Amino acid sequence: MRFGFLLNEVLTGFRRNVTMTIAMILTTAISVGLFGGGMLVVRLADSSRAIYLDRVESQVFLTEDVSANDSSCDTTACKALREKIETRSDVKAVRFLNRQQAYDDAIRKFPQFKDVAGKDSFPASFIVKLENPEQHKDFDTAMKGQPGVLDVLNQKELIDRLFAVLDGLSNAAFAVALVQAIGAILLIANMVQVAAYTRRTEIGIMRLVGASRWYTQLPFLVEAMLAATMGVGIAVAGLMVVRALFLENALNQFYQANLIAKVDYADILFITPWLLLLGVAMSGLTAYLTLRLYVRR
């Protein structure tokens, strides 16, 4: 097939179905943009989770008799417990926090509690950094019930709750993207049907003179995939605009405090090939199936 003929057929299809083509481009842009937003949230959650996991610590709270009578972990019970923790293969580092230090640390983090919280409210504890914070349950189970242990707290459970919100946001974006994708598929199918109908005479003549089915249907496939490519381009541009105008300003303080990972232009460029593949494959497959069902001769 000559490229000039193919280009002319594609441009003719666009001219005859301008409004439907624009609607398909915009619907594809919205669905692909939402899907890309969901992918960015997933990347944000994974990168931020890595930041927090590096900071995660298990805290082994000690009983009242140890907290009240041992400020430097010199007693036999405290030393034995510390040695038991340090000799574990899954432990990376251990530090002792006495009652006064625990109180000072709490007031530093939450100064509003200074007038209502007494020093006796905070037990002494061991702050333990694990080799793999993801596998904290084995450590927690081993520590509970040990002599001198009051309770065990792991920060990873709190982090999991935090990132459950991000997971919910990404799932919501994917769900809306799916609905929009269905709309885009219906528009593509409708556009291909209308384009084939408006050119039915030309197609019939071409078939009579021996043109293959593939020869007559390729312009419709290219038309749909080209429109989808435009939609993906708009979606990627939209993600960059959102990143520049919204995320950069709204999350700047969190970035500076290293509370969450930064969404960069490189992240958007990383997912762009996948978005392009998704958009072109969705449009091409839909157009092909529509032509197979609609144009049977």
Curated annotation (Swiss-Prot):
Annotated membrane topology: Multi-pass membrane protein
Pfam families assigned: FtsX, FtsX_ECD
Keywords noted in UniProt: Cell cycle, Cell division, Cell membrane, Membrane, Transmembrane, Transmembrane helix
Compartments in which it is found: Cell membrane
GO-annotated biological processes: cell division
Main location: membrane
GO cellular component: peptidoglycan-based cell wall; plasma membrane
Gene3D superfamilies per UniProt: 3.30.70.3040
Extracellular side, ranges: 43-171, 241-267
Residues exposed to the Cytoplasmic side: 1-21, 193-219, 289-297
Highest taxon of the lineage: Bacteria
Spans through the membrane: 22-42, 172-192, 220-240, 268-288
Family stated for the protein in its record: Belongs to the ABC-4 integral membrane protein family. FtsX subfamily.
Function recorded in the entry: Part of the ABC transporter FtsEX involved in cellular division.
NCBIfam families referenced in this protein's UniProt entry, alphabetically: FtsX_actino
PANTHER family per UniProt: CELL DIVISION PROTEIN FTSX
Subunit structure comment from the entry: Forms a membrane-associated complex with FtsE.
Protein name stated in the entry: Cell division protein FtsX
Taxonomic path: Bacteria, Bacillati, Actinomycetota, Actinomycetes, Mycobacteriales
